[in-house]
Amino acid sequence: QKNIPLLYLSTVYYKILQEYPGATYLICQEGFQKSEEYAASRHCPVYGTGGSVTTTALDVCIRMKCRRVVFVGLDLAYTNMQNHASGTADVRRKAEGNMVVKDIYGHDITTAKNLNLYRKWIEQRIQKADAAEMEFIDATQGGAQINGTTIRELHEVIFD
């Protein structure tokens, strides 16, 4: 872990920073006034967070001008009507506010309002001009279709 830098938002739990053994870098987030003020005072960029870790990481990757972004495990839907993997403490089924979207195979799949908002945020973000030269691959096995991504098997991405 000492060789892996940690990018964090100003809203991070403070003990994580105290206990992390490697380098840490603050990401100033859009829409959080104190963070925007801090960034302005130090002439630092602000990043779109989109409400999730994935959307924040995507904005960072785009700003870093990464050649390729590969999404893995990004279902953005309820596979078997679960919101977390089997065996975790947070597995639960929800019905209120759910909606149906198309999955990567063109079939209907259930998702939640927040997951669909993340999906739409990602779709809009990868269509912006600063992401035009990048490749976005969805290597998740299933899940909601993210327009603008190419569907590929993870082993193909790794070994090609």
Features from the language model and the residues they span:
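Metal-ion/cofactor- or nucleotide/acyl-coenzyme-handling active-site neighborhoods
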Residues: 1-160
